[in-house]
């Protein structure tokens, strides 16, 4: 190492060490009595702070501050600005972008104490604090015969999902989750506490809905709720498809232009090394009668699946039911500290030959890498509700996406890092060629991090966002 490199490293180490030792002195005096400061070097750090869903591309904190009041957050931000200390806000910890890996020598503002839920049944409004997750609100909403757009996992943060868009199985009926957002309480990057809505700071409210993670700390958010569809009952259909993949993609393509607003499809593809074949599971959620669901799903059910199941459940039990109940088992989308490397892309239609050729590429990669446990997820959600809001009304730029593909690399072997990244980038390019869009389209909440702001927000909206 050259002398300049040694000096740079030494100065960085000294600065980081000094900041680590001084966190209590800097932030402690003005925090409320129950707020906590935890150093990353503390033995109990991982037990008392919110852990991430994936450790791949994780940030490197000096420590975390756990505020209890909005004033605490204001104080933390003002002190951080004064001393040029970087900070990241942690809600549910479900983000997966690798851009966080570049975060060093800063602090986490851990919002774990901000989980209040208030449902005003008469006003049909729901207010949640900044770290509330969907499992906190599902039962209260169901009991009141109300609903909002929900994701496929109960551990996702309500506010975090909203700020990036908020796709879900109900979006055909109610639009994106951000379309139901009415107002937020926000601590700005300079430490001011303001309320933001269509009538208060309307330009900022525009930006918050789709690019909200860039504008401060949302301490609470208020939503319009909707009358529960079909009396609060939902049909869940699971299909374990045969290994003839071409017919599966052909069945999926049958819904390219005809997916009803009440129907949402999710396909999960994994690899069975025993039989040396990728396996496909199909989940369908239908907000209506079971007989109608089965009729609509005939393109899949006519394929003579290995196994299938259809059940009608209360909507608050839906997430425990999908994929034969496998989604609710320990692990997967809600277990913490997993190693998951995700790339994503949005499509406008299903190009069957492109899917067939990709399955061959995927099979070859599995065979070449025996310790690779990758999978991919296809979310085909209806767009009628999302498209009912003018594109110009919010910063969210991808209402026209019909299908989101998550290419998920699950592995712990560090030697797989380069080949997995190369393969998943090539996979994304493969689907981009037949995506139906001129440019790469990626939902920001699913973004890997290498796509760039033009992809996350589009060039058309980036100018306004930059001005904000």
From Swiss-Prot:
An example Gene Ontology molecular-function term: FAD binding
Pfam families membership: FAD_binding_4
Inducers of expression: Expression is under the control of the azaphilone cluster-specific transcription factor azaR.
Pathway stated in the Swiss-Prot or TrEMBL entry: Secondary metabolite biosynthesis
Keywords assigned: FAD, Flavoprotein, Glycoprotein, Oxidoreductase, Signal
Coiled-coil region list: none
Cleavable signal peptide: 1-16
InterPro entries for this protein: FAD-bd_PCMH (IPR016166), FAD-bd_PCMH-like_sf (IPR036318), FAD-bd_PCMH_sub2 (IPR016169), FAD-linked_Oxidoreductase (IPR050416), Oxid_FAD_bind_N (IPR006094)
Cofactor: FAD
SUPFAM superfamilies: FAD-binding/transporter-associated domain-like
EC number: 1.-.-.-
Residues modified by glycosylation: 44, 272, 348, 464
Start and end residues of each FAD-binding PCMH-type domain: 54-228
Function: FAD-linked oxidoreductase; part of the gene cluster that mediates the biosynthesis of azaphilones, a class of fungal metabolites characterized by a highly oxygenated pyrano-quinone bicyclic core and exhibiting a broad range of bioactivities. In the first step, the non-reducing polyketide synthase azaA forms the hexaketide precursor from successive condensations of five malonyl-CoA units, presumably with a simple acetyl-CoA starter unit.
Family named by the database record: Belongs to the oxygen-dependent FAD-linked oxidoreductase family.
Protein known as: FAD-linked oxidoreductase azaG
Taxonomic classification: Eukaryota, Fungi, Dikarya, Ascomycota, Pezizomycotina
Annotated gene: azaG
């Amino acid at each position: 190492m050259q002398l300049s490199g040694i000096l740079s490293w030494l100065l960085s180490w000294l600065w980081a060490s000094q900041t680590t030792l001084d966190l209590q002195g800097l932030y402690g005096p003005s925090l409320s009595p129950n707020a906590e400061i935890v150093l990353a070097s503390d033995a109990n750090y991982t037990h008392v702070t919110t852990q991430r869903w994936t450790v791949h591309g994780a940030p490197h904190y000096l420590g975390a501050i756990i505020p209890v009041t909005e004033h605490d957050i204001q104080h933390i931000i003002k002190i951080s600005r004064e001393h040029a200390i970087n900070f990241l806000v942690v809600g549910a910890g479900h983000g997966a972008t690798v851009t966080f890996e570049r975060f060093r020598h800063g602090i986490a503002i851990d919002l774990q104490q901000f989980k209040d839920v208030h449902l005003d049944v008469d006003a049909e409004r729901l207010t949640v604090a900044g770290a509330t997750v969907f499992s906190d609100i599902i039962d209260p909403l169901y009991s009141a015969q109300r609903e909002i757009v929900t994701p496929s996992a109960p551990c996702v943060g309500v506010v975090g999902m909203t700020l990036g868009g908020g796709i879900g199985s109900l979006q055909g009926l109610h639009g994106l989750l951000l379309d139901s957002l009415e107002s937020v309480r926000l601590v700005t990057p300079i430490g001011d506490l303001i309320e933001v809505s269509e009538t208060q700071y309307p330009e900022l409210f525009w930006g918050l809905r789709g690019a909200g993670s860039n504008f401060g700390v949302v301490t609470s958010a208020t939503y319009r709720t909707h009358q529960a569809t079909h009396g609060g009952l939902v049909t869940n259909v699971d299909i374990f498809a045969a290994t003839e993949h071409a017919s599966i993609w052909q069945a999926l393509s049958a819904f390219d232009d005809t997916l009803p607003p009440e129907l949402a499809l999710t396909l999960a593809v994994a690899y069975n090394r025993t039989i040396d074949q990728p396996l496909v599971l199909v989940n369908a959620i239908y907000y209506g009668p079971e007989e109608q669901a089965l009729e609509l799903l005939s393109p899949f059910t006519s394929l003579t699946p290995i196994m299938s199941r259809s059940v009608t459940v209360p909507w608050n039990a839906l997430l425990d039911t999908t994929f034969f109940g496998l989604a609710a088992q320990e692990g997967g989308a809600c277990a913490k500290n997993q190693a998951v490397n995700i790339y994503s892309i949005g499509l406008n239609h299903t190009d069957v030959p492109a899917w067939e050729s990709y399955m061959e590429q995927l099979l070859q990669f599995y065979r070449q890498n025996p310790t690779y446990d990758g999978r991919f997820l296809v979310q085909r959600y209806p767009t009628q509700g999302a498209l009912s809001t003018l594109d110009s009304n919010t910063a969210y730029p991808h209402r026209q996406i019909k299908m989101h593909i998550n290419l998920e690399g699950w592995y712990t072997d560090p030697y797989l890092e380069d080949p997995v990244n190369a393969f998943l980038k090539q996979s994304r390019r493969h689907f981009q060629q037949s995506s139906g869009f001129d440019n790469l389209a990626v939902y920001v909440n699913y973004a890997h991090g290498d796509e760039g702001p033009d992809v996350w927000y589009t060039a058309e909206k980036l100018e306004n966002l930059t001005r904000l």
